[in-house]
Each structure stands twice: as structure tokens, then as C-alpha cells.
């Protein structure tokens, strides 16, 4: 007898909004040589095929740093670097071109698989490579001749777009051609960044050895603004990790974000399904560098009523919150502040002012179950207190039956019912017998 798979059903339902949002979007994938030689690369290829099936336009930029170093070492050539850039002489470049060419064919072969009973069955991905990147030499710096090391001069946006319009997957190597007929060794991070910015891509996705950028506790930081990411980059450089994959990809992500790419992501190439979880779940798995946060606290509007009801209904049924009808919410929606994350309301609170006494009640405080162990409650209290202060309120109070200690930990002190505004005293429910706590905010 076949068994139901509720986890599969749940995953499909949760990912549906993101499938709709991402369809037709352009993603640039940046994959270093470390990712390509990792055992999980076959799974990443399957995930790339899935993205293509879902109608996402893909450009894959690959690097070859470890493969280059290994091939040069076998040839007895010591790798030379200056200011984090490889110095590519004639002998080195001949080997690097062979390595990159081999990798390009290997990646194309992997993306072309169509074996039965595999995720690639019937994938039929059309992989397109070409002279999409025009390069120029780096020249001489500090007396060091970079020889065949170059930088990106121009991206053929029209050519790449034409291939994407025809549902091709564009594969770009770190070797670029110049207008003089020469070729140059490029930084794959620079290539990916320029492609993402010039294409006006929706996302740049970087595959790192770690699950994004880690904090001091070894946990992945879910979201960073460019300024915050820059501070972490300085810390990495001071720790001597300026050449690490995380540092290189972080530089590219920051520059892409500042160049107009809305979101750049750092995910692990070692963890199976990391990219899919990052793209198709609300909280992701890695780190995203964003121009604007996916989460915001704001005043509620009439369109938010359905989401607020979904959030507070379970708490009303448990007796934690007083029941509110849709009609009541519609009339009082201007009193609500919400926290929204990717279209989902994960927190709400209402502010009822009693101007004569310069007091206000914070009511209907609710946080989504998946976010109760975070600081969303503190954010909500701070936002409501800030709003009350702007209105001239000096004292904020709450009525609660279950969350007394939570509010006490945040500076709220016990208050007698008799100390409430007269109008609020008349509405006090003596059967419910809620505890009253207050906090000075002036």
C-alpha cells in the first residue's frame, strides 16, 4: 500500500509563492572550481535542471582556481600572485586554457545528461557557450607584469539575452577574448559580478564552502546589507582570510548589490539541496546580501486583514488573545503595526491611545510560531513604542494572561486596574482577570 508523504505536500505548498515569483527571472550562478570537483556537484546540476524547468533564466559562470593550481604544480610551475591576482605568464596560460576548456566540456556533459530514473531525465538543457565576455589586459602594476591576466572590458548583454530568450543555459568560463584577438585569464568572481550587473539579473548566487557567512557562534547570518557585509569582509581580511572563498564571494555580492542586483546569495556547495532551500523557503539556508530587507515592520493596511486573522486565530482559540471579528479589524486596521516577511505577516500589535491621560494600550500582540524564539517580539514592542512616542504618549500598558514574565523582562511593571484610563477601566473584563503591566516611554 502506498503511503502519503505529508512533508512533500507541505514543501510544495510552501514553495509555490516562490515558484511564481522566480518564473521568468534571471539568475547568475557563480561556481568556483572547488564546487565543481565536490561529490555534491551532481546534485547541484540536478537542481540547476529543476530551476530551468521552472522557467528561470540561468547564466552559469565557473572558476578553475584549484584545478589550475593542481595542473601548474604537476608541471613544476609555482603559482604567482600579486594583490590577490594570479600572474599568468605564457607557460602558465597554456596550461590554464587547457584546464578551463576541459572543465567547460565536463560541465556541459553533466548538464546534458538525460538518463532514465534520474533527476536529469527529459531535462534537455541547451547549454550555450561563446565569446560573451570581452577582456583587456591588466598590464603592469607596481613593476609586476600580469602578462595574460586581464579584466572584463565588456559583457555582450544582447548576445546572452538572445540565448536566454531561446531557453538556453549560458555557460561562461573565466577566459575572455580581446578585440585584438588575444585571450586573457579573468577572475570568475569579476565575470559573474559584471554579468549579473550588466544583465540586470534578479539574483547572483555564489557557491561557497560554508553555508553563507557565519557569525561568532558558527551560525549562518540570514541577511546582510552591503554596509554590514563590508564590515565582516574587513574582519576576514584582518584574520588573513582575504583569499578565502567566502571573502571572494562576499566582495562580488557586495559589488553586485551596489550595482543594482536586488539580492545576492551565498550558499554551500557541500550541502545537498542548499540552493533550493535558499530560493524556495521563507528563511532560506545561507546568507543573502540585499539592498532592501525581505522583512519590514510597517503600518497595516486593509489588504493585511487576512494575514492578521491567520496569525491571531490560533491564539484566540487558545484563549491567549481576545477574539476580534473581521469587521472589527477593518474598523481598527489603522491602529495595527505588522512585521511582514516575503508577503507573510509574522507579527502584529495594535495601539489604542487615551490622549487625555497620555497613555496607550498595546494589544493583540502576536508572533508567528516559527519566529517566537527570535527577536521579532522585541522589534514589535520597539516599533509600537516609537509610534506611541510620536503621538505624545508617555506610558504604554498591556493586559495579558499568559505573557506576564515576557513583558516584565522588557521593562514593564505591574499596574493596578484602577490606574488605567477611566475609559479603559469600564471595558476591563473581570472574568478574564488579565494582569496589567506598564512601561514609561517618554
Swiss-Prot record:
Domain of life, source organism: Bacteria
Q: Which GO terms describe its molecular function?
A: L-glutamate N-acetyltransferase activity
The record's GO CC annotations read: cytoplasm
In Pfam terms, one family for this protein is: Acetyltransf_1
Under the heading InterPro entries, the entry gives: AceGlu_kinase-like_sf (IPR036393), Acyl_CoA_acyltransferase (IPR016181), Asp/Glu/Uridylate_kinase (IPR001048), GNAT_dom (IPR000182), NAGS_kin (IPR033719), NH2A_AcTrfase (IPR010167)
Can you give the residue ranges of the N-acetyltransferase domain? 295-442
- Provide the reaction this enzyme catalyses: L-glutamate + acetyl-CoA = N-acetyl-L-glutamate + CoA + H(+)
Give the record's GO biological process terms.
L-arginine biosynthetic process
Under HAMAP family, the record lists: N_acetyl_glu_synth
Q: What is the recorded name of this protein? A: Amino-acid acetyltransferase
The source organism is Aeromonas salmonicida (strain A449)
Amino acid at each position: 500500500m502506498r503511503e502519503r508523504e505529508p512533508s512533500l505536500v507541505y514543501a510544495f505548498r510552501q514553495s509555490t509563492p516562490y515558484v511564481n515569483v522566480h518564473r521568468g527571472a534571471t539568475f547568475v550562478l557563480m561556481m568556483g572550481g572547488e564546487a565543481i570537483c565536490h561529490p555534491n556537484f551532481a546534485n547541484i546540476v540536478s537542481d540547476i535542471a529543476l530551476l530551468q524547468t521552472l522557467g528561470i533564466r540561468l547564466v552559469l559562470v565557473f572558476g578553475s582556481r584549484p584545478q589550475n593550481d593542481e595542473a601548474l604544480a604537476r608541471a613544476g610551475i609555482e603559482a604567482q600572485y600579486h594583490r590577490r591576482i594570479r600572474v599568468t605568464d605564457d607557460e602558465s596560460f597554456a596550461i590554464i586554457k587547457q584546464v578551463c576548456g576541459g572543465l567547460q566540456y565536463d560541465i556541459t556533459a553533466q548538464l546534458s545528461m538525460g538518463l532514465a530514473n534520474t533527476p536529469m531525465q527529459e531535462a534537455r538543457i541547451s547549454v550555450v557557450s561563446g565569446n560573451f565576455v570581452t577582456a583587456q589586459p591588466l598590464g603592469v602594476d607596481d613593476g609586476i607584469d600580469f602578462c595574460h591576466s586581464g579584466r572584463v572590458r565588456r559583457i555582450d548583454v544582447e548576445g546572452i539575452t538572445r540565448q536566454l530568450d531561446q531557453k538556453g543555459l549560458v555557460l561562461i568560463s573565466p577566459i575572455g577574448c580581446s578585440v585584438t584577438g588575444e585571450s586573457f585569464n579573468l577572475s570568475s568572481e569579476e565575470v559573474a559580478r559584471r554579468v549579473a550587473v550588466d544583465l540586470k539579473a534578479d539574483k547572483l548566487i555564489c557557491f561557497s564552502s560554508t553555508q553563507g557567512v557565519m557569525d561568532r557562534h558558527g551560525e549562518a547570518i540570514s541577511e546582510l546589507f552591503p554596509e554590514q557585509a563590508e564590515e565582516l569582509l574587513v574582519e576576514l581580511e584582518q584574520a588573513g582570510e582575504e583569499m578565502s572563498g567566502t571573502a571572494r564571494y562576499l566582495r562580488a555580492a557586495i559589488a553586485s548589490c551596489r550595482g543594482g542586483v536586488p539580492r545576492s546569495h551565498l550558499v554551500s556547495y557541500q550541502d545537498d539541496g542548499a540552493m533550493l532551500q535558499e530560493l524556495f523557503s521563507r528563511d532560506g539556508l545561507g546568507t543573502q546580501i540585499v539592498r532592501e530587507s525581505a522583512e519590514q515592520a510597517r503600518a497595516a493596511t486593509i489588504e493585511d486583514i487576512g494575514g492578521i486573522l491567520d496569525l491571531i486565530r490560533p491564539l484566540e482559540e487558545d484563549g491567549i488573545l481576545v477574539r476580534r471579528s473581521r469587521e472589527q479589524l477593518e474598523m481598527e486596521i489603522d491602529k495595527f503595526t505588522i512585521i511582514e516577511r516575503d508577503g507573510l505577516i509574522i507579527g502584529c500589535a495594535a495601539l489604542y491611545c487615551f490622549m487625555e491621560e497620555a497613555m496607550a494600550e498595546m494589544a493583540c500582540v502576536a508572533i508567528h510560531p516559527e519566529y517566537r524564539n527570535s527577536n521579532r517580539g522585541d522589534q514589535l514592542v520597539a516599533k509600537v513604542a516609537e509610534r506611541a512616542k510620536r503621538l505624545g504618549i508617555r506610558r504604554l500598558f498591556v493586559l495579558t494572561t499568559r505573557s506576564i514574565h515576557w513583558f516584565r523582562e522588557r521593562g514593564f511593571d505591574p499596574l493596578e486596574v484602577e490606574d488605567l484610563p477611566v475609559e479603559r477601566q469600564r471595558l476591563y473584563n473581570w472574568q478574564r482577570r488579565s494582569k496589567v503591566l506598564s512601561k514609561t516611554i517618554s
